[in-house]
Design a protein with these regions (language model features):
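A short, basic N-terminal segment
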Residues: 1-35, 40, 217-234
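Walker A/P-loop nucleotide-binding motif
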Residues: 41-59
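Conserved P-loop NTPase "ATPase switch" module shared by AAA+ and STAND
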Residues: 94-118, 122, 129-138
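The conserved phosphate-sensing helix
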Residues: 198-212
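Short glycine-rich substrate-engagement loop in P-loop NTPases that contacts/grips substrate
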Residues: 66-100, 110-116
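Short regulatory helix/loop adjacent to the ATP-binding pocket of P-loop NTPases
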Residues: 141-156
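Short conserved motifs of the RecA-like P-loop NTPase core
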Residues: 185-197
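Conserved AAA+ ATPase "SRH/arginine-finger" region at the nucleotide-binding site
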Residues: 158-170
Length: 234
């Protein structure tokens, strides 16, 4: 087993990253993306947005939905941020035999010369085999540093959606929505405190909530303001 195979085996989906746990207010691009990605008839889609808009969550949710609906056929989630320094051919080899492939954080490799032809060829193999291919990045295809025109053409060949940054009110509801899923009650006061003291980024906020969940479960404590301040040291 080579280094890449060892790493790929170690990649685990976050079991909290499901469609049920994805906060997507009706009428927002997040809601549209959720509906689009749940539709397994869409063979290729490209979703972009800034950090914290839910891209990785959505990709993992699609894989987990696929796993619960089908008894056979593989769903593959590749976080390119972790895999970008491995040989592209090695990373993408044979994946077109899967039912579903999710490439997360394409920005990490889009401007690399050694990834251009392998990505283009992989697109073609997926198209020929009917493999569903989903891609995320932080910007629309035209703004990526893609070096191969044919690859850019492939990236633009399907539906592209751009997610929006969550507003403070959305982040508060997102925190409370996720807390409820963990069996926790998060008051408006505590949620606002977290937004005031922590970066307004869903990744950071969810990590804080998971830490609070672990300690509150262990100590059988409610999420009061003093408790939250102590646990997070803020």
């Amino acid at each position: 087993v080579n280094d890449f195979q060892q790493l790929s085996l170690a990649i685990k989906l976050d079991n909290q990253a499901t469609f049920d746990n994805f906060y997507a207010p009706t009428g927002t691009p997040q809601h549209l993306a959720k509906m689009l990605l749940q539709d397994e008839g869409k063979q290729y889609a490209y979703v972009c947005g800034s950090s914290g808009t839910g891209l990785s969550h959505l990709m993992q949710a699609v894989c987990q939905q696929h796993g619960t609906r089908l008894s056979n056929g593989a769903a593959v989630y590749l976080p390119l941020k972790e895999l970008c320094d491995y040989p592209a051919d090695q990373v993408l080899e044979g994946l077109e035999s899967s039912d579903l492939v999710c490439l997360d954080d394409l920005d990490q490799v889009a401007g690399r010369e050694e990834w251009q032809a392998p990505l283009f060829n992989f697109f073609n193999r997926c198209s020929e085999s009917g493999t569903r291919l989903l891609i995320t990045a932080h910007t629309l295809p035209d703004y990526l540093e893609v070096l191969l025109d044919d690859l850019l053409s492939r990236l633009k060949s399907g539906i592209s959606l751009q997610l929006i940054d969550y507003k403070d009110a959305d982040l508060r509801r997102l925190l409370q929505h996720r807390a409820s899923g963990l069996g926790l009650y998060l008051s408006d006061e505590v949620a606002r405190f977290l937004l005031h003291r922590l970066p307004r980024n869903s990744h950071v906020l969810m990590e804080a909530l998971e830490k609070l969940d672990g300690v509150s479960l262990r100590e059988q404590r409610r999420l009061t303001l003093p408790f939250v301040k102590t646990v997070l040291d803020i």
